């Protein structure tokens, strides 16, 4: 009985000491593929939600490439959304707003230091 308790404590300590085991990223590719919701279809495909990327029927290399490219595309879409919000807020030209929004500057040209107000 004492040996069982000692082993239980030892394994629990090892598990919690390695925080990667407790995170989604710490799971192996095969395990991630079974718990992720991915779009239907066949072949290697990925589903991205926030910082989590799930792959189905992919090699680790293909999954990594899909997730990297997908996250970049999601970031670009977010920039375009910010651009559209900026233009709708002030009625400025699309080119001006997008250059401001893409640079991460405040969308309001007046507070961004541009003299057009």
Curated annotation (Swiss-Prot):
Which cysteine pairs are covalently linked by disulfides here? 36-87, 44-55, 53-58, 54-98, 63-83, 67-117, 86-97, 107-110
Q: InterPro entries under this entry?
A: SnTox1_CBL
Q: Report, from the record, the phenotype seen after gene disruption.
A: Impairs pathogenicity on differential wheat lines harboring the Snn1 gene.
What does the induction field say?
Expression is induced in planta during disease development and peaks at 3 days post-inoculation correlating with the onset of necrotic lesion development. Expression is increased in the absence of toxin A (ToxA).
Q: Where is this region: Chitin-binding domain?
A: 87-117
Q: Where in the cell is it found?
A: Secreted
The UniProt keywords, alphabetically, are: Disulfide bond, Secreted, Signal, Virulence
Q: Where are the transmembrane segments?
A: none
Q: Which BP terms from GO are recorded?
A: effector-mediated activation of plant hypersensitive response by symbiont
Q: What is this protein called?
A: Cysteine rich necrotrophic effector Tox1
Q: Which organism is it from?
A: Phaeosphaeria nodorum (strain SN15 / ATCC MYA-4574 / FGSC 10173) (Glume blotch fungus)
């Amino acid at each position: 009985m004492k040996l069982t308790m000692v082993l239980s404590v030892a394994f629990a300590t090892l598990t919690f000491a390695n925080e990667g085991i407790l995170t989604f990223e710490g799971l192996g590719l095969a395990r991630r593929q079974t718990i992720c919701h991915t779009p239907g279809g066949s072949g290697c495909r990925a589903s991205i939600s926030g910082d989590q990327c799930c792959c189905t029927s992919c090699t680790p290399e293909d999954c990594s490439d899909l997730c990297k490219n997908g996250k970049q595309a999601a970031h670009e879409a977010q920039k375009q959304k910010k651009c559209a919000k900026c233009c709708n807020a002030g009625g400025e030209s699309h080119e001006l707003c997008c250059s401001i929004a893409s640079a991460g500057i405040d969308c309001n040209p007046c507070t961004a230091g541009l003299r057009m107000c």
